[in-house]
Amino acid sequence: MPITQIISASDSEAGPKPSISLVPDKPSEPETSPRHHRLSRSLSKFKRWRGRSNSSLSMGSSEQQELQDSPNEARSDDDENGYNNDNADDLAKSKYMMKSIAGLLTTASVYAGMNNAQEMNVLSQVDSEESDSSDSFQENIGRNEVKSKKENLKTKSHPEVPRLDKRKPTLFDFSITREKLSKDNVAKLRQRFCLDEQEPFLNDFPAWLLKDVLVQGHIFITTKHFLFFAYLPKNPRSVKMSGNLNIRTKLIRSTRYWCVLKNHLFSMYTSSTELYFPVLTIDLREVQKIETQKHTLNGSATKTFKLYTDESTFKFNADSEFSAKSWVNALKKEQFAAQNSENNSISLKIPLPNIIEIDDQPIVNKALTLRLRALESSQTYAIDDFMFVFMDGSGSQVKESLGEQLAILQKSGVNTLYYDIPAKKSKSSFGKETPATVEQKNNGEDSKYLNVPTSAVPSSENGKKSRFRFRERSNSWFRRAKPLEDSQVEDVEEIYKDAANDIDSSVHSTIHIHEQEDSQEQTVAWKPSHLKNFAEMWAAKPIHYRNKFIPFQKDDTYLIKETEEVSANERFRYHFKFNKEKSLISTYYTYLNRNVPVYGKIYVSNDTVCFRSLLPGSNTYMVLPLVDVETCYKEKGFRFGYFVLVIVIHGHEELFFEFSTEVARDDIERILLKLLDNIYASSAEGSNISSASLGDVQHNPDSAKLKLFEDKINAEGFEVPLMIDENPHYKTSIKPNKSYKFGLLTIGSRGDVQPYIALGKGLIKEGHQVVIITHSEFRDFVESHGIQFEEIAGNPVELMSLMVENESMNVKMLREASSKFRGWIDALLQTSWEVCNRRKFDILIESPSAMVGIHITEALQIPYFRAFTMPWTRTRAYPHAFIVPDQKRGGNYNYLTHVLFENVFWKGISGQVNKWRVETLGLGKTNLFLLQQNNVPFLYNVSPTIFPPSIDFSEWVRVTGYWFLDDKSTFKPPAELQEFISEARSKGKKLVYIGFGSIVVSNAKEMTEALVEAVMEADVYCILNKGWSERLGDKAAKKTEVDLPRNILNIGNVPHDWLFPQVDAAVHHGGSGTTGASLRAGLPTVIKPFFGDQFFYAGRVEDIGVGIALKKLNAQTLADALKVATTNKIMKDRAGLIKKKISKEDGIKTAISAIYNELEYARSVTLSRVKTPRKKEENVDATKLTPAETTDEGWTMI
């Protein structure tokens, strides 16, 4: 399918202008509304400080859960400690109007876009007359740089780039690195397929067997047989995919859940942080069919897909067609693996004389299909069809090799069917499924079934599920052919079994084929009765089960009867969709205390603690892996006569269970502690903290590349998921034939550039070309890491200087800011376009504060991503980082802050941007609706521990983890610093870091004196990084105005990844990078925010219980905060848990995987923004394209 057709119908239609409202319940009102003039006035009412409360960040519903606040001991009351006393002085108060970079842009853009306050209510986003008139306000101010660059510009003002629909289709060239079969492997294959020693192997080829999924394997051709062998992907306990989906029901139109695909279970949760309480769980072993819903008119894919089981049909809505297809592919692969979970390989053995027809047909470029029709057996004479796909063009070689060997057999006197029997029509793989005979010679049992969903055609139509089975040869289900005179015709064997011991001795598994059963008999139809066994429920005694993990005495009074034990275990597995590996140890009747007590039954198995509510109308389930449990302990009951057990979970709130008898409470505590001891003893690293909120596909670039390849071949009409062979002898990996050219565009400070350098280094390792586009002052920093650099104008230091040198708002400041900002933004727009147009990037990743990328990618028609460190996406979970309220105000307010910021930000730059689009880019004017900013793939380089993905985030919004740039390997600490650290340790003193960056304060000396006094009172050693001063750019900022005592060392800038592990606590301004570095080191963190997103991260650090947010900084408040940070054990332990979680994240790898995942979607979003047709003279002749423009994008499977 051409990429031009992969556009959502809703995206291709024009809609109304963006809207905004000042009423939380109605966040939508046109920008041209009379109320719009109140926006700037409303901004001044939003305080830049947010007070803390014990409630979680709200989404307007109790379903949205965030990381819980730390216990009261860790979050001491502000008044008691005094570090947030409202009456105290704030010596760190900015002398001037300090803002963050994006905040500066917002404020100045309002000034520039609204030159006259009386015209605010009549400004229009796309009115060229007003933008032109405002341009003439000071037309020549700040334009000298742009003018000189225009004169030297050799390229045309309008870009001549090929349209997406004019570019050549993607070329897929698959190949697998071949290794010669060793004697050991040949021997195992002979044993596997029961071959004679005198039967040599002639050839082997990589191939794909087509069923409901495309299974990668190998074809082997011997002198007598055609063999196919493939390892089924193993089923590790890892998340395969996760994200937000809407579930549609008859009663409730649509409900949004966080969905996780793991093993054979597809589970739904209320949020990404509540992963122990599933709302709905679907067992893929019971799923009959998975399909994408099609449009009734044109048959194109929609955002909806369905899962069919024997009892129900589940309907899901994804955020895009790409997301729906990704979910369907992932679910089909897991369904195939789950329904063959007791087997880890597929084998196919076809005697060469049985082959009737070999037909090859090209499909996509080099890809080729090979249909092989063979006689099933001498008993039934049914004809089976097998479809193979070759991605590297080797299919013709397979056909040629088979033809040559068949000719040799014919000459030697063997009767073959290849030429004797003409091809006849049969039910082939391109029609309905034909059940194939499957035989296992080494197993004497018959009537064995194995469920394998089969599909025949590479299309969206799914066939019915057929059963491949071991059956008697006397069975005559198939059409009989005329008997042949050759009585030596062998049978075709299609074997699904455990091949670990046959092929690879390093993989251990047991061959096990389950008995034939009716599908309705396989699922035990239990109907739980809440009124059954009332005696047991009221007695509330423990129930023990025989097991090999916790042995019980034979005379145990709580031991269940052997006759009831099997049915009890089966019911347990049925309720929680477990496999046979789970076995019960004990059960209890209890109350689960969360918001309200819920009565139910708790189940303890060998590695899981589960809970199921028993009250009518209640549907609470809990599945808690024991590896996530830290410990458990007894507590007094909340009610008289009840006894409480507290289960402590890593990085999660404690769970409280109330038991009516002390015996039951003590018994479950004893069993849980013993199981935890066994887990810790079996793991060399102790307990593993699982993170089920992040999918394996997000961490594994190979899985992401496979998804990108699936997206590309789906666009060609070949809609089938791929399963990679996990053969230990043939390593398979995917990488592009073409090296992509990435442009990383950002503006701001060093903290804005550094994450892009880390991402760029990761992309270079993937074999891509990377250019970082930013300010000239970072050239040496970027190039020192081996990354190409391009300079753009628009250095925000000039604008910041203007802001901090004017002590108050006045007419002079507004006029000066307006004039300088207009020249500043013009230079940024022009130079950014020149760089991107000259470099011909394939993909652009931009910080949204740079403002220009979304327009440049529309002109160049390339995929566009955004990446940032703070909340920039519309959500009800978090407020915008620059409009953080003084207290939590709920989901409606949070959403409103994003709408408000977007409109104000766009209002200030729309006039210049639209003029630049028309005159330079050759595009039409635009507005917020046409830009579709909320549809752009977004990467947040923040840990999901600090910034959990919201339930209302779209599928293309990814919280990847921090992009750390480790410099500690090259850093050599000065001797003075090492001696200082050693002295603190030798004296047993706590060591803290204090640094606030280059900020401007009212009285630098007074602030330094307060800091010294606080350190002395807290009795700690301090490594100081002084950067504050009374004027921006002051060269004396690094020098101290007062003499420092012996326990304070002013050392200047030191790499955080080296320094922070050396200290016990950190005090800083709360920037995203610094916050990530301190939490990565497991440090209790004290944050004194000054502007922008620093307030947001101060609140988050306090919310998760690993630090303190200071409203005001003076000697007393800082001293109190230092004492808490260095002595509070609960805060220290919680910071250690956060450290473990962050250490398991790989933000760069996850980001690269997300880029691969969303690349085709990003391309479609860019294309959908192209609304204005180009002029005829701007059309590009495909024959005149540069080599870079005509290069095919290919992927190689190695």
Curated annotation (Swiss-Prot):
Residues 1-89, 124-162, 427-467 are annotated as: Disordered. It comes from Saccharomyces cerevisiae (strain ATCC 204508 / S288c) (Baker's yeast). Residues 1-11, 452-461 have a biased composition (Polar residues). The keyword Repeat applies. Changing N892D: In M7-1: Changes substrate-specificity towards protopanaxadiol to produce ginsenoside Rh2. UDP-alpha-D-glucose binds at S749, R750, D752, N1025, N1053, V1054, H1056, H1069, S1072, G1073, T1074, D1093, Q1094. Its main location: cytoplasm. This is Sterol 3-beta-glucosyltransferase. Residues 187-236, 570-636 form the GRAM domain. The lineage of its organism: Eukaryota, Fungi, Dikarya, Ascomycota, Saccharomycotina. Sterol glycosyltransferase responsible for the glycosylation of ergosterol to form ergosterol-glucoside. Also shows activity in vitro on other sterols such as cholesterol, beta-sitosterol, stigmasterol and tomatidine. In contrasts to what is observed in Pichia pastoris and Aspergillus oryzae, is not involved in cytoplasm to vacuole transport (Cvt), pexophagy or nonselective autophagy in Saccharomyces cerevisiae. CDD domains: GT1_Gtf-like, PH-GRAM1_AGT26, PH-GRAM2_AGT26.
